Amino acid sequence: MIEFSVNKTRANLDVDPSTPLLWVIRDHLGLTGTKYGCGIAQCGACTVHIDGQAVRSCVAPVSRAAGKEVTTIEGLSSDLSHPLQRAWIEEDVPQCGYCQSGQLMSAAVLLREKPQPTDDDIDKAMTGNICRCGTYPRIRKAIHRAAGKIAMGGAR
């Protein structure tokens, strides 16, 4: 049995400890916002937080989450009220949308660590997240917009 918390809800699962966290999140917990992209931690589509740090869930064994807090895109906000989600919508970031949950999760860590990031900070933090539609300029603009919202008290 592996016990951990997902989006502030306790999970106690009888799964192989080496099972990738991604498949536990999607198949056992039914949280499908986290996407499978490459399976080798190169694209960032599967990014979740473990104790507040961005982790590629496609290669992280579920045992890594034991006793910890996992946050998925569903845990960022269930009603799209998180400043990043609002900024993503306002800047019309998604095209196909497949990479967006991973992009948002990486951006959330960035803004927690650097509330007013520079373009260079954003580029460095988001390097591991690939968008095959090429929406990088809109992603950067949305992160700046979210930083502004948070600075004005828009954080939840």
Model segments located where?
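Signature of N-terminal electron-transfer/Fe-S-associated modules in redox systems
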Residues: M1-R156
